[in-house]
Amino acid sequence: MKYLLILLILNSFTLLSHTEDKSHASAQWQIDAYGSAAPDFIGNYATIIGGNGEILHKGTNGWTCSSANARPFPEMGWSSAHEAMPFCLDENSMKFMNH
C-alpha cells in the first residue's frame, strides 16, 4: 500500500509538471501569443499576422494582431510572447498605421 501511495504521488507530480512542447515558430503558438495582446473577446476573433507576414488566422471582428518586434523573425520563433511584443489594432488604427 505504501508503494502504491508513493507511486501515485510521483505520478501526480509528473502530470502537474507537464507542459505542452509547442514550437514558438508554429502558427498555433503565434496565434496564441499575438492574440494575447488583447482581451479574449477581441484576440480570439482577430486576424493574426505571423512573423513572416502571412495571415495565420482570418478574423471576423475587424481587429488585427501581430508582433511589434522590429527584429527579423527568428527561425525558431520568439522565446516568449513578451519578446514578440504582440499588439492588436482595430480597422481605423490599421488605416492610420499604413498611412
Regions found by a protein language model. Name each.
Residues 12-21:
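Bacterial Sec-dependent signal peptides at the C-terminal "C-region" and cleavage site
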Residues 3-12:
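Sec-dependent N-terminal signal peptides
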Residues 20-99:
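Primary mode marks residue(s) on the alpha4-beta5-alpha5 output face of response regulator receiver
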